[in-house]
């Protein structure tokens, strides 16, 4: 049984530093059913997009569960805190795109990816989702002025009133924690929540 729970640690190896059992609550267990309900499963007109090479494994999990194609944004950093989209790997032309990330801080990577999908890739609509919405600095202004139709985040970080936009959708993680705690109490598998 687990003694601690966490939502979407950025590096799975962190679990090795705890002296007690830890369950990593994956944000995908909330986000994937939401996407399936909104866009369907196995649709050819919707593409899951990794906003950078570091998010490919996460995006691939979404494509497998949702039976949707994958596209990848290949970006470069010519200098610190500056990213530039070099290529879009995969077909997004005429498609709805869903950018999948773990954390959105200043939203620079996310918005550059959304711009590239529309302007260079020919995507018809862009959506985005992430487990954690830090939304610091220029994030809100960037998101508001971007082609992103809807950003869905989890309530792992409280969204203050000055950060609330009509295009930001917040999903609760409490049901996942509730189910995990019940399974820990009943001494049944927690990991099957995230398969």
Please give the residue ranges for each predicted region.
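Acidic, metal-coordinating catalytic segment for phosphate/diphosphate chemistry
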Residues: 140-195
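PRPP/pyrophosphate-binding module of the type I phosphoribosyltransferase fold
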Residues: 37-51, 58-164
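Hydrophobic alpha-helical segments within soluble ligand-binding/sensing domains
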Residues: 25-43, 174-186
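Active-site regions of enzymes building and remodeling cell-envelope glycoconjugates
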Residues: 19-23, 68-69, 165-172
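Glycine-rich phosphate-binding "P-loop"
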Residues: 11-30, 99, 104-105
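Short acidic/polar capping segments at secondary-structure boundaries
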Residues: 9-12, 27-31, 53-56, 77-78
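Short, small-residue-biased leader/transition segments that mark boundaries at the very start
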Residues: 2-7
């Amino acid at each position: 049984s687990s003694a601690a729970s966490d939502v979407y640690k950025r590096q799975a190896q962190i679990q090795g530093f705890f002296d007690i059992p830890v369950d990593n609550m994956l944000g995908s267990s909330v986000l994937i059913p939401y996407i399936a309900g909104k866009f369907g499963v196995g649709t050819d007109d919707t593409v899951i997009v990794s906003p950078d090479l570091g998010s490919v494994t996460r995006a691939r999990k979404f494509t497998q569960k949702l039976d949707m194609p994958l596209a990848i944004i290949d970006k470069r950093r010519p200098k610190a805190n500056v990213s530039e989209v070099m290529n879009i790997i995969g077909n997004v032309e005429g498609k709805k795109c869903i950018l999948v990330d773990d954390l959105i801080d200043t939203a620079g990577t996310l918005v550059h990816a959304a711009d590239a999908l529309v302007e260079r890739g020919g995507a018809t609509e862009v959506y985005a989702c992430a487990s954690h919405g830090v939304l610091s600095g220029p994030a809100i202004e960037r998101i508001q002025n971007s082609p992103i139709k809807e950003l869905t985040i989890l309530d792992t970080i409280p969204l203050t009133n000055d950060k609330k936009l009509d295009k930001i959708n917040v999903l609760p993680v409490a049901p996942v924690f509730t189910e995990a705690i019940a399974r820990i109490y009943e001494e049944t598998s927690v990991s099957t929540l995230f398969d």
